[in-house]
Amino acid sequence: MDIFQAIILALVQGLTEFLPISSSAHLILVPILTGWQDQGLAFDVAVHFGTLGAVVTYFRTELSAMARSWLSSLATRNPDDEAMLAWAVLLGTIPLGVSGVLFHDLIETYLRSPLVIATTTIVFGLLLWYADKTGAQTRCEYRLDTGRVIVIALAQVLALIPGTSRSGITITAGLMVGLDRSAAARFSFLLSVPAIGMAALYETKNLLEAAVPVDWLAIATGVAVSGVSAYLCIHYFLKLLERIGMLPFVIYRLVLGVVLFVMFL
């Protein structure tokens, strides 16, 4: 992999990981459309750690407060808002982790085709539009009860299907259970910390077992570019979300899905 390819693929990962348009779909599609060889497991690990570093850095104050309050609540059994949000993130992660272990091979074998990606891109794009139009949008992320967290957690499982978008489906579910746009996005990004962390650790395990040669320049480029682009993406997405809504992302998904159908049918 040359540096130009590393920069492009890292930008794709960084710019799509937190937008509701599916990073996995774009990373699958770019090599198909460009004719590039698969970027390899080591590069996948690099860009996952890059985006993980971005979200942890951006939400470092919130994550630190949540961790302290959660640990304190274990002793006092009197959780405050930050501790309850930490419990919500933990609960919201369990179904994804279990499903990832159970269905990983099935998904890798049968659900990574361009036509599957085209279908999920369109279907879940329309669902995002519906949720944005009809959701009550009256709650913040600190007012999530167990039932609403479970709905978002189960929705996140669908993100295992390429083209769905983890951020897209969790924001959609958040809007459907009454979160406002910013709260739905923030909770989605908090959920991404364990989600991306689990993916990075799983890929790291596979990388160590495979003992493949590593292009350290491409790896360093992937971490840096994906991390910086992801951080900027989070910042500007949250800044502009209430103003622009979800419609631009819905339109993008519909256009992308149609283009994929035309190309691969």
Model regions: which residues?
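Multi-pass membrane proteins that catalyze or facilitate reactions on polyprenyl-/lipid-phosphate substrates
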Residues: M1-L265
